[in-house]
């Protein structure tokens, strides 16, 4: 079988040296992706296209599908090579190949020609089209919007019958631009922004700020692995996880409520910038869209940018949520995003939409930056190729209850502000406040002869924290969902 790979049009207008470099990188990417299906396949570079030849016919569907997901490819033609002697011979072979497909249909013939022949493309279109019209009584020619387009390619003394055409995702080949680090949360925005930079030729590494224990990290790892495996498996990338709970705890205790959101984002940018510098990455990528939430006003985005000298790319800055979700659906990350947890521990009750630099710097003056340095130094760096095996491990399920016994203790793990706004008052049971960001350090000090039921408003943070405690060896925890 043979595939003709047509280049993304922007590649074809580059200078000769740049064009050749892009084609070489794309050829290598194609070979890296497809070798898992057929190690004997051949990838041949040409000035205006790339040929892929494979021997195993059983792999035709998966190879064709994989090609549609490699950045840099405009479309793919599945072709059958044949010899020809003259223009009439071309017609005879086309009639043989297309007769059944054209019966009762409108059609047109489109020809692309390379090399030296004694006819031009229009000659072939007229001759073959007229012949098909005469020999297939139920078919008729229609040059605009036909039901079937008969595509032929002629190169020197070879005729290529186009059996199928598939659209690619376009863009530049991965690796033609420099590396970036995507701040991924597993939601709609960060997945789409990562995809858009991959499609623009960047090798995208992933940085995840963990606020919810191992269960949340496993979910985000799955999203990152899916994006890499689907659109950029030709290149090795990193997945870096940073335990950010200590940072959140410090912010909740030391920073004024209205400034928390901007300060948290600035801390994330600082941490990600250190990671980027460590691995020689040129820019950060976020899924922020102008005005979507309080921290994403122009004023606040500018202050967030000022936290670091590292370039921050925001490919979704002018996109609305509906369009972002549509793209997530198209690339296959929608289901991941819909099930990704949103935490009950809201970082700020009354966030500012127009932060003042002096005020932010004053609040950050109360922050212990040694905590930020520590979590960055302890960041976990994983080769994304190993994630597939790791995520197959089952996350231990924690028991959820709607009722309690008198000898059990309800742990209200919401933030202090949430507890003040909506106090949890229950009769015949002890209710003990212990914010989620203190659980990892203070749960071990509690009376371990008792069973603790973790409570938060939506039940997501409580479940993830219970999973984390189970992983640490504590078996006396459940989730309370009244």
Curated annotation (Swiss-Prot):
Domain spans labelled THUMP: 61-165
- Keywords, sorted A to Z: ATP-binding, Cytoplasm, Disulfide bond, Nucleotide-binding, Redox-active center, RNA-binding, Thiamine biosynthesis, Transferase, tRNA-binding
Provide the GO MF annotations for this entry: ATP binding; CCA tRNA nucleotidyltransferase activity; tRNA binding; tRNA-uracil-4 sulfurtransferase activity
Which residues are catalytic?
A: 456 (cysteine persulfide intermediate)
Q: Which domain of life is it from?
A: Bacteria
Q: Where is the Rhodanese domain?
A: 404-482
**Enzyme Commission code(s) on record:** 2.8.1.4
Residues annotated for ATP binding in this entry? 183-184, 265, 287, 296
Pathway this chain belongs to: Cofactor biosynthesis; thiamine diphosphate biosynthesis
Q: Which cysteines are joined by disulfide bonds?
A: 344-456
Q: What does this protein do?
A: Catalyzes the ATP-dependent transfer of a sulfur to tRNA to produce 4-thiouridine in position 8 of tRNAs, which functions as a near-UV photosensor. Also catalyzes the transfer of sulfur to the sulfur carrier protein ThiS, forming ThiS-thiocarboxylate. This is a step in the synthesis of thiazole, in the thiamine biosynthesis pathway. The sulfur is donated as persulfide by IscS.
The family annotation for this protein states: Belongs to the ThiI family.
Q: Which HAMAP family match?
A: ThiI (MF_00021)
Protein name, please? tRNA sulfurtransferase
The gene coding this protein: thiI
């Amino acid at each position: 079988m043979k595939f003709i790979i047509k280049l993304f049009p922007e590649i074809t207008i580059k200078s000769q040296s740049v064009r050749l470099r892009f084609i070489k990188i794309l050829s290598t990417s194609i070979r890296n992706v497809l070798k898992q299906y057929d190690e004997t396949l051949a990838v041949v570079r040409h000035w205006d296209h790339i040929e892929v030849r494979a021997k195993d016919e059983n792999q035709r569907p998966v190879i064709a599908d994989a090609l549609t997901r490699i950045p840099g490819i405009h479309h793919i033609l599945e072709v059958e090579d044949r010899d020809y002697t003259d223009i009439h011979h071309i017609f005879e072979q086309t009639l043989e190949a297309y007769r059944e497909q054209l019966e009762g249909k409108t059609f047109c013939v489109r020809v692309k020609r390379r090399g030296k022949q004694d006819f031009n493309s229009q000659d072939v279109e007229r001759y073959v089209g007229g012949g098909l019209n005469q020999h297939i009584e139920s078919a008729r020619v229609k040059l605009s919007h036909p039901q079937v387009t008969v595509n032929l390619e002629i190169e020197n003394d070879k005729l290529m019958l186009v059996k199928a055409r598939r659209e690619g995702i376009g863009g530049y080949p991965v690796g033609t631009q420099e590396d970036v680090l995507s701040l991924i949360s597993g939601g709609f925005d960060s997945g789409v922004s990562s995809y858009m930079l991959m499609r623009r030729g960047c090798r995208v590494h992933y940085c995840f700020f963990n606020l919810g224990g191992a269960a949340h990290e496993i979910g985000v790892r799955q999203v990152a692995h899916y994006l890499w495996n689907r659109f950029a498996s030709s290149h090795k990338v990193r997945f870096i996880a940073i335990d950010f709970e200590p940072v959140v705890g410090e912010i909740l205790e030391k920073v004024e409520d209205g400034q928390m959101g901007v300060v948290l984002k600035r801390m994330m940018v600082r941490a990600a910038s250190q990671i980027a510098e460590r691995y020689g990455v040129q820019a950060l990528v976020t899924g922020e869209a102008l005005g979507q939430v309080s921290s994403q006003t122009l004023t606040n985005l500018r202050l967030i940018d000022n936290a670091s000298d590292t370039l921050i790319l925001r490919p979704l800055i002018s996109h609305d949520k509906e369009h972002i979700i549509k793209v997530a659906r198209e690339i296959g990350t929608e289901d991941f995003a819909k099930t990704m947890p949103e935490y009950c521990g809201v970082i700020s009750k009354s966030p500012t939409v127009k932060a003042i630099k002096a005020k932010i710097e004053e609040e950050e003056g109360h922050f212990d930056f040694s905590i930020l340095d520590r979590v960055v130094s302890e960041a976990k760096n994983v080769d994304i190729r190993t994630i597939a095996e790791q995520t197959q491990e089952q996350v231990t399920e924690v028991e959820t209850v709607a009722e309690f016994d008198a000898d059990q203790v309800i742990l209200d793990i919401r933030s202090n502000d949430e507890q003040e706004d909506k106090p949890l008052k229950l009769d015949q049971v002890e209710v003990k406040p212990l914010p989620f960001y203190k659980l990892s350090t203070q749960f071990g000090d509690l009376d371990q002869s008792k069973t603790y039921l973790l409570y938060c408003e939506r039940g997501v943070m409580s479940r993830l924290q219970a999973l984390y405690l189970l992983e640490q060896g504590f078996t006396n925890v459940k989730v309370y969902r009244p």
